[in-house]
Amino acid sequence: MSNWIKYRYGIIACLVMLFCLGLRIPREQKNQSVKARALMQAEQFSRRCDTLRLAADAFKFGKINQIDLQSELLAARQAYKRIEYLWEYLYPAFAEEHLNGAPLLHIERHDTRPFVIPPEGLQVLDEMVFADNAKEESAQILILAQKLSTSAKKLLAGFRGRSLSTIEIREAQRMELIRIFTLGLTGFDTPGSGNALAEAQAAMAELAVVDELLQEKLRLTQELRSRQLFDGALQYLGSNRDFDSFDRLHFLRGYLDPLYAQLLELSPVGSQSQLQSSWRPESKSLFSDDFLDPYFFAELKAAEDGEKVRALGKRLFYDPSLSASGEMSCGSCHQANQAFSDGQATSTSRIQGRSLSRNAPTLLNAVYADRYFYDLRAFTLEQQAEHVIFNTEEFNSAYEEILAKLSHNEQYRVSFETAFPKQGLNRENLSKALASYVLSLRSFDSPFDQYARGEREDIDPLVKEGFNLFMGKAACGTCHFAPIFSGLVPPFYVKNESEILGVPQTPFALQKSLDADLGRYANGIYSEQADIYQRSFKTTTVRNVAETAPYFHNGSFRSLENVIDFYDIGGGSGYRLDVYNQTLPSDPLGLTEREKQALIAFMKALSDNPFATIDK
């Protein structure tokens, strides 16, 4: 590394340590408004992007080496972390598409046709600039750096005239805490450099400055707990820089979650959030049962729901008369004592001697998704029921037939009129009643949840170790996002990811082959018939996973040990299967036997099925 780079890194390290030592912000800096400071940071980021563009050009023509280019990228990323909390809050779609989205191909829809769009932004550059073949990709790196520079200028121009309210700033701060924990500390955000902890520190330091500016603005002169928590968080991040050994659980309980609650207390009273998100700003913990709004994902609204609607939905859920044969109900494949799965590799068909093509996933916390089924073919809970009703191997029925049956049942007629006084029995209300019951199947009171919220003093050390592995070295948390531990993407929690793992048809066979199920590619949605979705399946929750064996869409893995071994070798690629579009990293994780057992201990600590002895 050249001397000027070492010198600059020394200056940056000293500045960061000033934060870590809890030194107070100078009075003249306190007098700046948050907007003025944010504008300063945005301008700094734009300048850094210009410098990165010049460095990428120099790298392409051999004027600087890869280490110099990496240094410039890290500086640009550090600058972004100081404006990230606001820009990703105010402009989430633009930020995801152009500034810091995941380095994965995605589609844009033109009419009904899918167009595959390559990713751009800081994460893609992080992956490419730190790759062994960076020189071979120098032309593409330059193109991406040029695009990033242009995007930064565009957003800066729009941001100049944007006013900020205190509620927006506080929500942006709290959402950044979620982002730091779920995307930053997990390494999701830094796929090539692994510079996760330093970037988390930069983002946290900026939140601390903004907090003091807000306190000055509101004339809060008393020593607030938020200052102490920020100081402690920065010190901890500064003194614990090893990614694999970083104690994320201690950081969550000791600093981040208390800060999340404290900043809520400092938020303006009575202010109404304008966010289009399932995140509930009034929640006090990342692991509280009100962290997300389940009604965000359903056509049924909270004002329509109630005990009578839920009771009606429960009765319908367990009523076999909804199926044409009168022998199958929703509860046939989703059994309460097995966390609403059925324990079979693939569920039993209504046709004797046959099975359905896929495993029955749990319905506990299933509401927290914008897409349903393994292939994501349904967009709401209500649509999910519709697919089961029409499926010839399941209910093999139709709404008209079901409504006719129910209309001849006096108890059902009365129940619908009581639950839905304005319209009574109809197709829409039938779907809403079923959705109400499924929506009620929520569980956030596992031993781990209680410990994370500080409601219990201790938990098995193996569980702690497993959580830190899950969110760190094992990289589970980069696809199974906290706190749902599914593919519901933080911090807005409005859309689900699907992944291509290369799941084999029979993992224990000597000659293994890929499962033939095409997944999302064949979900009947024409605009998703793209190669990037071949054999792509929804990332389901690992909550209550101890009760839902066997695993994956085809139920081919019998135990959690089998599942972890599969991930440890790098998925289907680790079996030397031809998975040309695998999204799971193919590099082995190198987990020890103890680490594997720790992961299992953590996942078992997520067990919480209050409906196990349900009264039908």
Predicted stretch roles:
Residues 544, 551, 556-610:
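Extracellular low-complexity, Gly/Ser/Thr-rich intrinsically disordered linkers
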Residues 68-71, 75, 429-436, 598:
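Amphipathic alpha-helical interaction segments
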Residues 9-29, 232-309, 396, 400, ...:
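Post-cleavage N-terminal segment of exported redox proteins
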Residues 282-387, 452-557, 562-565, 574-576, ...:
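Short glycine/threonine-rich turn/loop motifs
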Residues 84, 97-163, 167-168, 315, ...:
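Extracytoplasmic redox metalloprotein regions
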Residues 49, 53-63, 73, 77-87, ...:
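Sec/Tat-exported extracytoplasmic proteins
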Residues 1-5:
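N-terminal secretory signal peptides that target proteins for export/translocation
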Residues 27-291:
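Mature extracytoplasmic or organellar-lumen-exposed domains after removal of signal/transit peptides
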